[in-house]
């Protein structure tokens, strides 16, 4: 049976404990906690929310987070961080990749099984170019996830809503045809989907078939 939760980004002005209070009060059993860098400069909607600062995750903080879950009887389904690791700016790309790896390590420290993110994309380049970038960037990320036994859930949102995201969007992993190519490159069981059927619906695709076809890759679910 699924546990019902929400993404903590919607409560960006709340403290971590206030997020747990809200979840408990409203009958949720889990929360996906946002872990953007505390010094984050990303300005898009829901970006930049930092409810757990993974750069400051010492033993005292880890114990505090564990106790919050016990106190409010609300678990953490995943840690989330959704940048563009395939950014065409090499320095920015490295910054995103490095922080993704920090969040994966935080999952291990907190005994959280899933880290959710985007594959990323250079919106000005075609799919084949971005596939080649994926081959360069993602093997080391998945190698770390495998080593620490943390599942990576890739959300399938195209991210093409603002001028800077056009024409291709800032997330490559948007359709089953592309998922197949990515899974062929990285067949690891730790590399899967944070599946949101709504993104297939508005792209006029079958949102039900992937639930069956990619059942072993559905590491986390978003619903709208």
Positions of PLM-derived features:
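Catalytic domains of carbohydrate-active enzymes, especially glycoside hydrolases
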Residues: 17-39, 108-113
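Aromatic-lined glycan-binding groove of carbohydrate-active enzymes
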Residues: 205-224
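A short, structure-level motif marking secondary-structure boundaries and short turns
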Residues: 3-6, 49-51, 87-89, 125-127
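Active-site acidic/histidine proton-transfer and metal-coordination neighborhood
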Residues: 63-64, 68-75, 84-195, 201-204, ...
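Hydrophobic faces of well-ordered beta-strands that scaffold small-molecule active sites
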Residues: 2-8, 29-33, 76-81, 115-117, ...
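Glycine-rich, proline-tolerant flexible connector loops at the mouths of alpha/beta enzymes
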Residues: 32-66, 121, 125
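Short polar catalytic/cofactor-binding loops
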Residues: 8-15
């Amino acid at each position: 049976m699924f546990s019902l939760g929400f993404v903590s980004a919607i409560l960006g002005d709340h403290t971590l404990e206030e997020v747990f209070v809200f979840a408990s009060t409203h009958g949720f059993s889990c929360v996906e906690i946002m872990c953007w860098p505390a010094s984050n400069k990303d300005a898009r909607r829901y970006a930049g929310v930092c409810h757990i600062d993974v750069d400051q995750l010492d033993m005292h903080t880890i114990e505090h987070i564990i106790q919050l879950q016990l106190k409010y009887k609300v678990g953490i389904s995943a840690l989330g961080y959704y940048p563009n690791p395939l950014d065409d700016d090499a320095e920015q790309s490295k910054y995103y990749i490095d922080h993704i790896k920090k969040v994966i390590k935080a999952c291990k420290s907190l005994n959280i099984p899933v880290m959710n993110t985007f594959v990323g994309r250079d919106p000005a380049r075609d799919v084949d170019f971005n596939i080649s970038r994926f081959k360069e960037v993602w093997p080391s990320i998945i190698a770390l996830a495998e080593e620490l036994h943390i599942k990576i859930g890739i959300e399938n949102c195209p991210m093409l809503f603002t001028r800077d995201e056009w024409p291709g969007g800032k997330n490559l992993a948007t359709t089953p045809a592309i998922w197949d190519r990515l899974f062929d490159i990285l067949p690891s069981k730790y590399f899967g989907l944070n599946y949101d059927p709504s993104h297939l619906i508005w792209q006029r695709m079958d949102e039900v078939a992937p639930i069956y076809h990619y059942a072993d890759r559905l590491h986390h679910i978003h619903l709208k």
